[in-house]
């Protein structure tokens, strides 16, 4: 069995975790107490959803997940909420003291007190697995726990489980909507530390999600619940192939193989369609061609950047629901005729396609309409460098004046770590730039030879 362990770190990670597990339970018909009326074989264990849930002797399904936060209030809501019986109490780990939006506290001071406990719980989950394939880590870039503790955890996971893949789902600080002044510091420090430990990181930009909620769902003032449910749908689409019997991306490592041409350029852009409210969906039926086209609209992306200014290195389309290959091929053929989509010249313009016949599920009473078919596009494009450039610029503005740096140094960091992290980010931007440059040299002599 190819199990996958989810780790939810910090407030953002935990709240997205709530949205995701709520959705997974609905998709698999698992009740909030972990019982699954439709599953007649107790302890069968060979169903696809067993990659995400383990089954107890009593027929209860328990998520293979760990929730960690350095302060208790957010996880206390899980402990008292609707799904309190779903999780084993040991899976919900809290500290006493907040990381206070400070990377150094999450990574050094407070983080180190709790890391061994967390790894111990992860080890217990890993021991229940017959063939663990890897971890997905959910966190924000901006928070202290999300940035600092995650990077510490990723380092330790690399030591303990060297060859297992590690996927990240990271909440990128929104360009306009900010929850902390020091977000750029935290983001750049955590990216620098986790860059070599993460195999693939899906970034989600809060502002992009806000705009989608406002524009497509007509929610004037989206709350975090609205945002998280939308993010939950996206995560569910990405992981659907691991949880249902699909034909493609049945494996975490397959994502990397298809999306990551160079180890450092591992930040695919996710786009999801259709995001549509119930009132609108009642009147229109969206075809495969329409939802496929929607994926190439910057408005539906999870990160604000413009792929029309960049080049694609890889592209993966994950369909779910009532979709047949014939329609998909037609839709892709149409898109290839549009010149707006440019691939790097060293990469064949192949679109990898996965079809999952399980239609998307929605949370009852939520904002999203129940649709017959949906698609999630994962593309690795050089345009994502725009997002890093924005962040680096904000970092530079503050760091030039050494603003707020004393809070980090006071927790035992050295100022050198800042400049080292910033240099690494500059290198990352450069990497993306170089990938997009055409490989011109050496073309002259090849023309004469026909193979």
Swiss-Prot record:
Instruction: Identify residues that carry 3'-nitrotyrosine.
Output: 282, 451
Signal sequence coordinates: none
Which molecular-function annotations from GO does this UniProt entry contain? GTP binding; hydrolase activity; metal ion binding; structural constituent of cytoskeleton
Gene Ontology CC annotation, any one: cytoplasm
One Pfam family name from the record?
A: Tubulin
For biological process, the GO terms are: microtubule cytoskeleton organization; mitotic cell cycle
Which InterPro entries does its entry note?
Answer: Alpha_tubulin, Tub_FtsZ_C, Tubulin, Tubulin/FtsZ-like_C, Tubulin/FtsZ_2-layer-sand-dom, Tubulin/FtsZ_GTPase_sf, Tubulin_C, Tubulin_CS
Catalysed transformations (reactions): GTP + H2O = GDP + phosphate + H(+)
Its function, per the record, reads: Tubulin is the major constituent of microtubules, protein filaments consisting of alpha- and beta-tubulin heterodimers. Microtubules grow by the addition of GTP-tubulin dimers to the microtubule end, where a stabilizing cap forms. Below the cap, tubulin dimers are in GDP-bound state, owing to GTPase activity of alpha-tubulin.
> This chain belongs to which protein, by name?
Tubulin alpha-1A chain
Q: Which organism is it from?
A: Sus scrofa
- Give the source lineage, highest ranks first: Eukaryota, Metazoa, Chordata, Craniata, Vertebrata
């Amino acid at each position: 069995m190819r199990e996958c362990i989810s780790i939810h770190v910090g407030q953002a990670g935990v709240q997205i975790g709530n949205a995701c597990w709520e959705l997974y339970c609905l998709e698999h018909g698992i009740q909030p107490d972990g019982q699954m009326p439709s599953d007649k074989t107790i302890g069968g264990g060979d169903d696809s959803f067993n990659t995400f849930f383990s089954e107890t002797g009593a027929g209860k399904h328990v998520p293979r997940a760990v929730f960690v936060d350095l302060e208790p209030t957010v996880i206390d809501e899980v402990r008292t909420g609707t799904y309190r019986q779903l999780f084993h109490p040991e899976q919900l780990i809290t500290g006493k003291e907040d990381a206070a939006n400070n990377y150094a506290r999450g990574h050094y001071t407070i983080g180190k007190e709790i890391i061994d406990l967390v790894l111990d719980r992860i080890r217990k989950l890993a021991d229940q697995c017959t063939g663990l394939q890897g971890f997905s880590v959910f966190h924000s870039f901006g928070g202290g726990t999300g940035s600092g503790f995650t990077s510490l955890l990723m380092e330790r996971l690399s030591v303990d489980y060297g060859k297992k893949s590690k996927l990240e789902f990271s909440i990128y600080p929104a360009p306009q909507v900010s929850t902390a002044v020091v977000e750029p510091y935290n983001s750049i420090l955590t990216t620098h530390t986790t860059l070599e430990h993460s195999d693939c990181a899906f970034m989600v930009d809060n502002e992009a999600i806000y705009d989608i909620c406002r524009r497509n769902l007509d929610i004037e003032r989206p709350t975090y619940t609205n945002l998280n449910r939308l993010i939950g749908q996206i995560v569910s689409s990405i992981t659907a192939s691991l949880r249902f019997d699909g034909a493609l991306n049945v494996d975490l490592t397959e994502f990397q193989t298809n999306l990551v041409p160079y180890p450092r350029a591992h930040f695919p852009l996710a786009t999801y369609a259709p995001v549509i409210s119930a009132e609108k969906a009642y009147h229109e039926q969206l075809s495969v061609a329409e939802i496929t086209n929607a994926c190439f609209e910057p408005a539906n992306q999870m990160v604000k950047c413009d792929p029309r200014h960049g080049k694609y290195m890889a592209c993966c389309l994950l369909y779910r629901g009532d979709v047949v290959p014939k329609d998909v091929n037609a839709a892709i053929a149409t898109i290839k005729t549009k010149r707006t989509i440019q691939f790097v010249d060293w990469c064949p313009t192949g679109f990898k396609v996965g079809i999952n016949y399980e239609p998307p599920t929605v949370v009852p009473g939520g904002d999203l309409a129940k649709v017959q078919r949906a698609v999630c596009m994962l593309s690795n494009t050089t345009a994502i460098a725009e997002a890093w450039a924005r962040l680096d610029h904000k970092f530079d503005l503050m760091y030039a004046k050494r603003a707020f740096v004393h809070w980090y140094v006071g927790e035992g960091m050295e100022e050198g770590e800042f400049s080292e992290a910033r240099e690494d980010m500059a290198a990352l931007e450069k990497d993306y730039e170089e990938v997009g440059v055409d490989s011109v040299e050496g073309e002259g002599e090849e023309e004469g030879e026909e193979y």
